[in-house]
């Protein structure tokens, strides 16, 4: 069967199964465990638009009866996960044409299951992000902001949960139309 799970959907499934794992560990009532499993199943299926019967069967978590089955399920599910398409150096230069002295990262990435391509330009201390939104490659240049150590953050793009070293707060660089206006937005994103 063809890959049908986006990387961010896979991360969401992992988060749902983490909650189910906590239920297995902290609860002894089988009725509560079954209800938690049904809620997790509903959450997983609701993050997909259209699924065939075969895809629904692959996403079925009814056979998970212990926390050990969760890791096996996720390993089996990982073969159906896909990421963004390959990006060329010319595409990056075109997207970030306003960036001076742009340093392109190594595009021979081992993990092809990326949600976005991002790298930190050490000279300017900027995070440069390329994301495929509905078939169009978008680029964004962001300021890195210090965040509290040992805090858990959730990546906006891929739903990965990590500490401040893995998921950082960034603010896109915005140029206002009027000099008196100031606008700053921010969000959490994976740094690796």
Describe the role of every protein-language-model region:
Residues 123-151:
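Short, charged surface segments at domain edges that flank catalytic/cofactor-binding sites
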Residues 20, 68, 105-107, 166:
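Alpha-helical context
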